[in-house]
Every structure is written in structure tokens, then in C-alpha cells.
Design a protein with these regions (language model features):
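Cysteine-centered nucleophilic/redox motifs
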Residues: 98-124, 145, 240
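Extended, charged low-complexity segments
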Residues: 255-309
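Acidic low-complexity segments
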Residues: 28-53, 290-295, 299-307
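Cationic, low-complexity basic patches in intrinsically disordered or flexible, solvent-exposed regions
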Residues: 7-10, 27, 31
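His-Asp-centered catalytic microenvironments across diverse enzyme cores
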Residues: 31-49, 64-70, 127-267, 273-274
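Secondary-structure boundary elements
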Residues: 33-97
Length: 309
């Protein structure tokens, strides 16, 4: 497997995944919505280029999305609803100036890619990042996408927090692929792949995935579990992440890390005002006025945790 995998027309097969799965849109009518406002989405991320379904378009919107729409988990941390309905996602992430976690981010991105004319398959992954050695295999709790561009499959993912991809990757194993940030690579594993990134010259795993297509209900189950399970870290820890052209911002409770030019600056946000300011400035969030949010920020500001990304 030393060459980029191709969609073989007309059968369109990738590692045994048939055309009805690989093409995406016919297989998943639930993800095609006339209620999606492409103009508003493109304005939100600051894209004014071509709307042709080309690799240049895909790379451009993939880079802009994580800079404009950050990863954040305020809703589950506050016990607020996390809806995956496209109208709710547009109200929150587009019109509302908020961010979200992987399901919100990649479902929104999926609708944008559909509207631009791309053929997309919905995938799921098991997270490996920061998992201690010998950790039991976790659930498929992360969403990513497979995008067909002129017969070539690309992995797209705008929702993986502090190490989010900022460029789609060819589904081509063993090759280090540059991004606007760190190099990434895919390694074959069992019937799927492991995604790794290079940190300080060392390759580290992020997640493993197969090409088995996912239905909207699959994401609803994982979304509900992460929102409600008492041991879900998203109910216990404030997390924020944003990838800008000049670096990465990562927030874990009251610890802010700024990764830029191969250096990392860390600082403690010692009160609720500093936390709110960072969320609004560093993470470009429009925060609601809420006594619950104010109380949570005050509580989190008294913690001390090291950011992992």
C-alpha cells in the first residue's frame, strides 16, 4: 500500500467499501438538507474563493474552519443541550459565534461540503491521544469524514480539538503529509488506519478508524453518551482549541497553552474575567450572558490542570 488509494469508477471501491457507501450522499439522505445556508457558513469562516468541488477548495475551507469555529465544550459542561440538528448547529456555530465538539463541527462541515458538490462519507474513530499504555479499547467517540475529490479519497476532520487537522490528508499510508501546522501520516492497522502527527520529531497517535460508513443515529448515541455519562471528561473539564495560521491555542480548565514557532507559552487564567477574556479573544467565541456560565468560569478558574495539547 504505497500509492494513494483511488475510487475505481464505476464500482468505486476502497478497501472493500462499495460505491453506495463511498459516494456518501445517496446512502445518507438524512445529511442532505435544504435548510443549510452555505452563504452564511462561508461568510463565517471568511471564504470568498471558488465554489467548485476541487482539492483547492477543500484545502481552503478546511484550513479556515478551525481558525474561525473553535473546539469548545461549554454546553455539556453546563448541562445544556448539544443538538446535532443542522438548524441548531447553524444557529449556534454560524449565527451564534460559538464553537462545538467533533460531532457539531464535522456535521456542519459535512453539510457545507455537500452544498459545494463534494461526495462525502461519514466515519467514526476510536481516540488514542493521551491514552496511557495498555488502556482498553475505547468506543468510537469521534467523527471524521472521507471526501472523494476527482476519484481520490481524502480524510477531512475539523473537530479534533487541540490537534485538529488543518488540511485534508490523502488516504495514503506511510507517507508524511504536510499541513499548515504539524506533519501527519496514516498507518494501516487491521482493517483501517491510525492517524498520527509529528510532535518534536516524534510520531504520536491521535485516533484509529475504519472506512465503515456511519449513520446519523451512530453520532446521536455517542453525542448523548459524552454529554451525560458521569465519567465523561467533557462534563468535568473545560476544553477549548483553535488553530490559526500562526499557531495553536489550547485551553484545559484554567491553563492556556499557546503553541507557536515550535515553542509553547503556558499561563494560568486565575479568575473568571481572565477566562472569559481568553475565550472571547484567543478562541474568538461570542459568549452568552448567563449566571450559570459565570459561576462555572469562577469555579474553573480555581483549578490547576496542565493542558494536554
Amino acid at each position: 500500500m504505497n500509492e494513494a488509494l483511488q475510487f475505481d469508477e464505476p464500482t468505486q471501491t476502497i478497501l472493500g467499501v462499495s460505491s453506495s457507501h463511498a459516494s456518501g450522499r445517496k446512502f445518507y439522505p438524512e445529511f442532505v438538507s435544504s435548510k443549510f445556508d452555505l452563504d452564511a457558513y462561508l461568510a463565517r469562516i471568511g471564504y470568498t474563493g471558488s465554489r467548485s468541488a476541487t482539492i483547492d477548495t477543500l484545502e481552503a475551507v478546511h484550513a479556515l474552519h478551525p481558525a474561525a469555529i473553535p473546539f469548545e465544550n461549554l454546553n455539556p459542561l453546563l448541562g445544556w443541550l448539544v443538538s446535532l440538528d443542522i438548524e441548531a448547529l447553524q444557529a449556534k456555530l454560524v449565527a451564534g459565534g460559538r464553537g462545538g465538539w467533533c460531532f457539531e463541527q464535522n456535521i456542519l462541515f459535512r453539510h457545507a461540503l455537500d452544498a459545494l458538490g463534494f461526495s462525502v462519507t461519514n466515519l467514526a474513530a476510536r481516540v488514542l491521544w493521551n491514552a496511557p499504555a495498555n488502556t482498553p479499547t475505547g468506543a468510537r467517540s469521534h467523527m471524521l469524514l472521507l471526501v472523494n475529490v476527482a476519484g481520490t479519497p481524502y480524510v477531512a476532520d475539523v473537530g479534533f480539538g487541540g490537534n485538529v487537522l488543518t488540511r485534508p490528508l490523502r488516504l495514503e499510508p506511510h507517507i508524511a503529509q504536510p499541513t499548515p501546522h504539524e506533519p501527519h501520516r496514516l498507518l494501516p492497522l487491521d482493517n483501517g488506519f491510525v492517524l498520527e502527527f509529528s510532535a518534536g520529531g516524534e510520531w504520536k497517535p491521535l485516533y484509529r478508524f475504519t472506512l465503515e460508513p456511519q449513520f446519523p443515529a451512530d453520532y446521536e448515541v455517542s453525542n448523548w453518551y459524552l454529554c451525560h455519562h458521569p465519567r465523561s471528561m467533557f462534563r468535568q473539564t473545560l476544553i477549548g482549541a483553535r488553530a490559526t495560521p500562526d499557531g495553536r491555542y489550547a485551553l484545559r480548565d484554567n491553563m492556556l497553552a499557546i503553541h507557536r514557532n515550535s515553542k509553547t507559552e503556558k499561563r494560568i487564567l486565575a479568575d473568571a474575567a481572565a477566562l472569559r477574556s481568553s475565550l472571547e479573544v484567543d478562541f474568538a467565541l461570542q459568549l452568552p450572558e448567563s449566571p450559570e456560565l459565570d459561576a462555572m468560569l469562577e469555579r474553573v478558574s480555581q483549578k490547576t490542570s496542565e493542558p494536554r495539547a
